[in-house]
A protein has these predicted regions:
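Catalytic Walker B motif of ABC-type/P-loop ATPase nucleotide-binding domains
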Residues: 179-182
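Conserved ABC transporter NBD signature motif
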Residues: 76-84
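Short coil-to-helix segment of the ABC ATPase nucleotide-binding domain corresponding to the Q-loop/switch region
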Residues: 112-121
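Helix-to-loop junction immediately C-terminal to a conserved catalytic motif
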Residues: 68
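ABC ATPase NBD coupling module
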Residues: 85-101, 205
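A short, proline-enriched helix->beta-strand linker immediately N-terminal to the Walker B motif
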Residues: 173-177
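Conserved ABC ATPase signature
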Residues: 154-158, 162-164
Length: 234
């Protein structure tokens, strides 16, 4: 993989199967799974901002799931942040995901813990041990997402936009080279969505590639970037 290339897909076909990382051979999964996308070639480099657009069911989310190994890559060549997706084992998946950031539309925050603990617990779970380093990194990401004065707040005390900023902060804790965002502005009003896009652009400018699925063409017009259209399984 080139030094600054974080995604490389060549001749990739993506299937949805009931047990994508089970014990069945790829040939059986291909035969019994549902073909979602075919003949995908894609390269993304550090610091690049890329939109994935298309109708619901066009395969945007399936591509993202393949990149963070929720779906197994069965056909074609694929590398993400140095990991070969065709050779990936179940035990490798946590290590892959520590090198990428993932932002979901539905937040998935720990509702019984405040902003600080939502981040602190993730860092402990991913191997951080030194207390001073943990607190320093939490301060850094909270400043980046403009939540430095909200660390004591509970998730229910935050607005929708602030909750999404917390999710982004969580995704950035391990300094990823790639951020994957699945419809991150889908539940937000236009002004708040603009703020999230500005934040993503700032993150990309710092060298982290951002790949974002969306159906909001107004955002793309206001914040133009490389755009990939998904239609008819491609």
């Amino acid at each position: 993989m080139n030094d600054n290339r974080v995604i490389r897909l060549k001749g990739v076909s993506i299937y949805h199967a009931d047990d994508p990382f089970g014990s069945y051979p790829p040939e059986r999964l291909v035969r019994e799974g549902e073909l979602i996308l075919s003949d995908i070639d894609l390269e993304v480099h550090e610091g690049e901002f890329v939109y994935l657009i298309g109708r619901v069911g066009s395969g945007k989310s399936s591509l993202l799931k393949t990149l963070y190994a929720e779906l197994q890559l069965l056909q074609g060549e694929g590398e993400v942040v140095g990991f070969d997706l065709r050779c990936l084992k179940r035990k490798d998946i946590p290590y892959l995901r520590r090198r990428i950031g993932i932002v979901f539309q539905d937040y998935q925050l720990l509702t019984d813990r405040n902003v600080f603990l939502n981040l602190y617990d993730v860092m402990r779970a991913t191997g951080w041990k030194e207390e001073a380093a943990i607190r320093k990194r939490i301060d850094e990401v909270l400043q980046l997402v403009q939540l430095e004065n909200k660390s004591y707040k509970m998730p229910f005390e935050l607005s929708g936009g602030e909750q999404q900023r917390l999710v982004i902060a969580r995704a950035l804790l391990n300094s990823p080279k790639l951020l994957l965002a699945d419809e991150p502005t889908g539940n937000l009003d236009p002004v708040t969505a603009d703020g999230i896009l500005e934040l993503f652009r700032e993150i990309a400018a710092l060298g982290c590639a951002v790949v974002m699925s969306t159906h909001n063409t107004a955002l793309i017009e206001e914040y133009p970037a490389r755009t990939l259209l998904f239609a008819r399984g491609r």
